[in-house]
Amino acid sequence: MKTLDTQLKLRYLGRQDYLTSWQAMSDFTNQRDENTIDEIWLVEHPAVFTQGLAGKAEHLLKHSEIPIVQSDRGGQITFHAPGQLVVYLLINLRRKALNVRALVTVMEDSIINLLADYNVIAVAKPDAPGVYVNGKKIASLGLKIRKGCSFHGLALNVDMDLSPFLQINPCGYAGLEMTQCKAEGLTLSVDELAPLLIEKMNQQLDYSHIESFHHE
């Protein structure tokens, strides 16, 4: 049966500036009501550091030409760049009967299950949200909840330049090493991994009527 809680709009945004995406998802969340269909956006960002609400200035270890944006998501500082799959989840949590912790678990489990399909063993850490392979972080998470609805989401390192992570304490953890799919032997591109990750997510979110839009 086609009801609001079974419908999803999936938007492939291509490469888009972080500030543009942030403003768009903030506006979407402010303007949505009980009849608004949930959306998931998939995007790659040009190189940018984003600082979460809990972020501390000292976690930026070195200044460079890479811009820094103060965001309204949870968490600390992280880095986005081409070759990283960013997924924004614009979900009415009340309608889906989800709390924040449950949505975090959905994101973590989806990445873990996807990597397992390619013999990459990944885990979540209860005290440090994200996904890790052999102690190295492969995916970062950060959410914002407004009016009972989520925005922001996750970033999965696929095939990117990881060196700017050395300019920060990733997610506030000094010395935290980062990894990516390519380094773990998974050679699919961002475009190839995106629908596979959505498929894993939807095994838990259970949208039965999905409409896809390509905005590149």
From Swiss-Prot:
GO biological process, alphabetically ordered: protein modification process
Keywords (A to Z) from UniProt: Acyltransferase, Cytoplasm, Transferase
Chief place of localization: cytoplasm
EC numbers for this chain: 2.3.1.181
Record has Nucleus as a keyword: no
Any one GO MF annotation of this record: lipoyl(octanoyl) transferase activity
An example Gene Ontology CC term for this record: cytoplasm
Signal sequence coordinates: none
Highest taxon in the source lineage: Bacteria
The UniProt record lists the keyword Cytoplasm: yes
Stored SUPFAM superfamilies: Class II aaRS and biotin synthetases
Pathway participation: Protein modification; protein lipoylation via endogenous pathway; protein N(6)-(lipoyl)lysine from octanoyl-[acyl-carrier-protein]: step 1/2
Catalysed transformations (reactions): octanoyl-[ACP] + L-lysyl-[protein] = N(6)-octanoyl-L-lysyl-[protein] + holo-[ACP] + H(+)
Annotated ranges, domain BPL/LPL catalytic: 34-209
Parts forming coiled coils: none
Alphabetized Pfam families for the sequence: LplA-B_cat (PF21948)
Subcellular localization: Cytoplasm
Family listed: Belongs to the LipB family.
Protein function: Catalyzes the transfer of endogenously produced octanoic acid from octanoyl-acyl-carrier-protein onto the lipoyl domains of lipoate-dependent enzymes. Lipoyl-ACP can also act as a substrate although octanoyl-ACP is likely to be the physiological substrate.
Name this polypeptide is given: Octanoyltransferase
Species this protein is from: Psychromonas ingrahamii (strain DSM 17664 / CCUG 51855 / 37)
